[in-house]
Each structure stands twice: as structure tokens, then as C-alpha cells.
């Protein structure tokens, strides 16, 4: 009898998670990269990155599974079996319990001008609801073991988000702010045709605050944006590729950065240029990164992107130039 009850319970559980709609989408890109470094031989690499996304929905419930299929093949290892890497990335479930939206699983954190989303945390959970036009979200994860509360909404044409982070474990992130509570504020609006954003981090940790702003406007078909981030001596900016591109990878604790970006369309091509200057806490570590990109949609449904990057590092002889051709 107990076995029959157990079988019935399992069958009921399996039925309850069946999905009415299942979709499978994906993307693929291939990159050829030539890197010419001062004092070293130039290198040529071909890499590919594929993603498959499986989504199942049943009413207001959704399950999302993302699988990455990457391969980093150089000219010398093109036939190496170790060059390919297939792994599960984001896996999460979202649903609603009354007026409360629930999401749980594994995913990347949200990009900000201070931090990219490279860190994927597990055991994530988010509970959110709207109260009088303000979205209130409470979230946490198994990696950091700290609860975060976010208030967001629009106030007189200004989008605002205020984040209160509880004390995380001191070894959870490797940053000075680990083990310390932080408050974050993000504002965005349009002033006389200029898109303006402002962000700040106020940490209980010593000399670990940061502030940043971006201003952008279109002039005669050319969008010009300026971004600036100022970090205290113990805070490290890990970057937002939209603002600082690859230059964020050169930033260390206490470094500041400024970026100017221009973007326009020419004969069906999207053309952009970005000039980033990293003002390092140690002057000998200053870096300038200039990037030029041309993107064009092709008739076959793919997109061709050509990027040239020139990196000039102060006090070193490892300046380099990189040409990257991407088909996606």
C-alpha cells in the first residue's frame, strides 16, 4: 500500500511540472583574432561560442535552461578534444504566488557601471511585488549568503533604484566590501535631450565607496556619450562593457576611468569608436584603450563585426593591437 501511495505521489508530482509550451532557441558566433604585442610574436586564434536555450511555460510558470557550447581552438590545437567545453549555465524557475513574483535557480547578476555580470551564483531566490507603483524585491543566494532589498520605480520622470545589501561573508567576493553592508543608488533621466545616469555605492568598509555618471546625446545622427567612474582607494571596478569595454580588465583596486564613445550609421553599417583612459591609483599602471568597431548585417541572416583595439599601457613594453572579426 505504501509503495502504491509513493508511486501515485511521484506521478502527481511529474504531472504538476509538465509544460504546455516548450521552445528551443540558440545562437552561434565564430571569431578570428589577430593579436600583435610589442616584443612578442603575433598570435592568430579562431574561437566559437554557441548557446542553446530551452524554455518551458505552463500558465504563469516558466523554466529556463541555458547551455553553452564553447570551443577555443588555436592553429596548433584545432583538432584537440580538450578545445570544446559544454556546460550548463543559467537554470531558473519563475512563477507567481498571489501578487508575489518568485524566481529561483542559478543565473548571472545584473550588470552595473561598477560590476559586470561575470559571476554566476547558485541557490538564487527573488521575491518581488509592486506597492503603490514601487517594486519591492528581496533576494539572496547560496554563494554570498547575504540578503539584498531593492526598491525601484519612477519619480517625476526619473527612474530610481535603491539597493540595501546586508553583510555578506568576508570571503564571498574577494573584495574589500565583502563582509560589509552596502547601499547603492541608481538614477536615470533625460534633461534637455541629454540622457543622464548616476550611480553610487556607499559601503561600511573603509575607503570602499564609488560614484559614476554617464551623459549621452545624439548630434546630427551621431550619438556621443561620456562615462566617468571614481573609486575609493579600496574599491575595484570590474566594469561595464557598454561603458569601458575591455579596459575594465586592466583596472585594479582604487583605479578610476573615463570613456568617450561615438556611434553612428554609415551606408547600412553601424560604426562606433570608444576611447577609454584608466587613471590608476599607481601612475605607472595607467592604460589607454581605443576601440573601433564596424557592424554589418549580411544577406544570409548573419552579422559581420570587425573590431580593432589599440592598448597602450604606461611603464610597460607589452602594448598590443588586436584585430577581431566576428561572424554571428
Please annotate each region the language model reported:
Residues 255, 284-287:
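Short amphipathic alpha-helix initiation/capping segments at coil-to-helix junctions
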Residues 201-267, 272-280:
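A beta-strand-loop signature enriched in Asp, Gly, Thr, and Trp
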Residues 2-156, 162-167, 175, 185, ...:
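Beta-barrel outer-membrane channel/assembly domains of diderm bacteria
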Amino acid at each position: 500500500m505504501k509503495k502504491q501511495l509513493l508511486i501515485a505521489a511521484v506521478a502527481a508530482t511529474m504531472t504538476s511540472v509538465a509544460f504546455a509550451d516548450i521552445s528551443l532557441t540558440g545562437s552561434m558566433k565564430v571569431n578570428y583574432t589577430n593579436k600583435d604585442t610589442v616584443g612578442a610574436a603575433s598570435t592568430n586564434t579562431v574561437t566559437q561560442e554557441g548557446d542553446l536555450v530551452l524554455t518551458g511555460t505552463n500558465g504563469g510558470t516558466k523554466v529556463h535552461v541555458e547551455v553553452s557550447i564553447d570551443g577555443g581552438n588555436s592553429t596548433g590545437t584545432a583538432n584537440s578534444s580538450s578545445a570544446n567545453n559544454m556546460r550548463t549555465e543559467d537554470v531558473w524557475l519563475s512563477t507567481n504566488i498571489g501578487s508575489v513574483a518568485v524566481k529561483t535557480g542559478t543565473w548571472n547578476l545584473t550588470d552595473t557601471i561598477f560590476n559586470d555580470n561575470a559571476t554566476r551564483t547558485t541557490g538564487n531566490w527573488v521575491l518581488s511585488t509592486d506597492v503603490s507603483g514601487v517594486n519591492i524585491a528581496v533576494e539572496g543566494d547560496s554563494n554570498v549568503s547575504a540578503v539584498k532589498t531593492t526598491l525601484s520605480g519612477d519619480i517625476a520622470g526619473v527612474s530610481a533604484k535603491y539597493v540595501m545589501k546586508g553583510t555578506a561573508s568576508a570571503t564571498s567576493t574577494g573584495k574589500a566590501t565583502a563582509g560589509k553592508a552596502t547601499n547603492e543608488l541608481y538614477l536615470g533621466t533625460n534633461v534637455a535631450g541629454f540622457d543622464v545616469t548616476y550611480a553610487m555605492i556607499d559601503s561600511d568598509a573603509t575607503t570602499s565607496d564609488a560614484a559614476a555618471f554617464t551623459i549621452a546625446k545624439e548630434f546630427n545622427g551621431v550619438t556621443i556619450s561620456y562615462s566617468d567612474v571614481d573609486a575609493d582607494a579600496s574599491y575595484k571596478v570590474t566594469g561595464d562593457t557598454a561603458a569601458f569595454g575591455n579596459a575594465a580588465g586592466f583596472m585594479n583596486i582604487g583605479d578610476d576611468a573615463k570613456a568617450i564613445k561615438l556611434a553612428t550609421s554609415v551606408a547600412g553599417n553601424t560604426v562606433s569608436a570608444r576611447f577609454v583612459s584608466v587613471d590608476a591609483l599607481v601612475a605607472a599602471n595607467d592604460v589607454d584603450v581605443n576601440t573601433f568597431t564596424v557592424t554589418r548585417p549580411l544577406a544570409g541572416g548573419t552579422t559581420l563585426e570587425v573590431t580593432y583595439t589599440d592598448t597602450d599601457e604606461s611603464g610597460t613594453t607589452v602594448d598590443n593591437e588586436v584585430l577581431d572579426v566576428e561572424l554571428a
